[in-house]
């Protein structure tokens, strides 16, 4: 008998979707354009930069046909500034990249993976939705394209720990009817924290249901014992009669 699938996307599935994100490559040799489901890939002409899906960039890197240009936010200086922001603001996450302006009212807004949040034109001070997956994949496959890969890896690890601790602390203070602001949370963070968050919410629901059942039992016992109201209710009735 097959076990039931967990709710939501698993971390491997999130990483798979991340491979559709656009990154910038510097080709080493000329390659013809490709017609893909996500759109047409322009011909690669060295040394001109080109934006391609992450999966294609990783393939070209393994074949030594291109180098990958890390996005501006994925360097030591930018990650240090973002980490300082995360530490200084313990109740909010660093703001995500701004969405591009909508061309017209008749067109749909652009969304991942068709944004330039991980290309060479990305903002240097904002973490995109797939920041953790992008960073780990690029460091694993193209560490030689980074100026200081060890420090970048260390900063990514620090960012992950600080943000996950912030996510847990925000969920722990919830009550049955409360909420937590999660603007700026990344895809892998949602996937990894889903079990913890759902566990806390389920616990709050059980506590609320138990309290409601206790209240109903107390009301039923009071009715069975001939309870006719509190002193405050008696005073209110007396004032109405006057």
Curated annotation (Swiss-Prot):
GO terms for cellular component: GINS complex. GO terms for biological process: chromosome segregation; DNA replication; double-strand break repair via break-induced replication. Residues 89-110, 209-242 are annotated as: Disordered. It is found in: Nucleus. The keyword Nucleus applies. The GINS complex plays an essential role in the initiation of DNA replication. Has a role in chromosome segregation. Belongs to the GINS2/PSF2 family. Component of the GINS complex which is a heterotetramer of SLD5, PSF1, PSF2 and PSF3. This is DNA replication complex GINS protein PSF2. The gene is PSF2.
């Amino acid at each position: 008998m097959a076990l039931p699938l967990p709710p939501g996307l698993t971390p491997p599935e999130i990483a798979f979707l991340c491979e559709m994100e656009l990154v910038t490559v510097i080709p080493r040799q000329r390659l013809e354009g490709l017609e893909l489901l996500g759109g047409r890939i322009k011909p690669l002409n060295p040394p001109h930069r080109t934006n391609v899906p992450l999966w294609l960039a990783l393939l070209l890197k393994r074949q030594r046909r291109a180098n990958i240009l890390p996005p501006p936010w994925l360097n030591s200086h930018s990650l240090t500034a973002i980490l300082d922001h995360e530490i200084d603001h313990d109740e909010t996450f660093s703001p995500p990249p701004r969405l591009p302006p909508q061309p017209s009212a008749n067109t749909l807004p652009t969304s991942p993976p068709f944004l330039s949040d991980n290309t060479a034109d990305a903002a240097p001070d904002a973490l995109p939705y797939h920041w953790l997956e992008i960073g780990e994949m690029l460091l694993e496959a193209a560490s030689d394209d980074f100026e200081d890969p060890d420090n970048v890896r260390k900063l990514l690890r620090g960012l992950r720990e600080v943000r996950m601790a912030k996510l847990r602390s925000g969920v722990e203070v919830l009550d049955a009817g409360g909420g937590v602001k999660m603007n700026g949370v990344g895809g892998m963070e949602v996937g990894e924290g889903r079990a913890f968050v759902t566990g806390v919410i389920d616990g709050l629901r059980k506590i609320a249901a138990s309290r409601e059942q206790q209240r109903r039992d107390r009301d039923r016992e009071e009715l069975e014992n001939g309870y006719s109201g509190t002193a405050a209710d008696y005073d209110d009735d007396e004032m109405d009669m006057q």
